[in-house]
């Protein structure tokens, strides 16, 4: 599992909310 990629995607999701 690529945690850095998950973290970056998570940040983008939070921005989109």
From Swiss-Prot:
One of its GO terms (biological process) is defense response to bacterium. This is Mastoparan-like PMM. It is found in: Secreted; Target cell membrane. One of its GO terms (molecular function) is toxin activity. Most of synthetic analogs show a decreased antimicrobial and hemolytic activity. Expressed by the venom gland. The keyword Hydrolase does not apply. GO terms for cellular component: extracellular region; membrane; other organism cell membrane. Belongs to the MCD family. Mastoparan subfamily. Keywords: Amidation, Antibiotic, Antimicrobial, G-protein coupled receptor impairing toxin, Immunity, Innate immunity, Mast cell degranulation, Membrane, Secreted, Target cell membrane, Target membrane, Toxin. The modification Leucine amide is found at residue 17. The keyword Nucleotidyltransferase does not apply. Antimicrobial and mast cell degranulat peptide. Has activity against both Gram-positive and -negative bacteria (B.subtilis (MIC=25.8 uM), E.coli (MIC=7.3 uM)). Shows mast cell degranulation activity (EC(50)=15-26 uM). Has low hemolytic activity (IC(50)=80 uM). Its mast cell degranulation activity may be related to the activation of G-protein coupled receptors in mast cells as well as interaction with other proteins located in cell endosomal membranes in the mast cells. Its main location: secreted. The lineage of its organism: Eukaryota, Metazoa, Ecdysozoa, Arthropoda, Hexapoda.
């Amino acid at each position: 599992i690529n945690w850095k990629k998950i973290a970056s995607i998570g940040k983008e999701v939070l921005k989109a909310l």
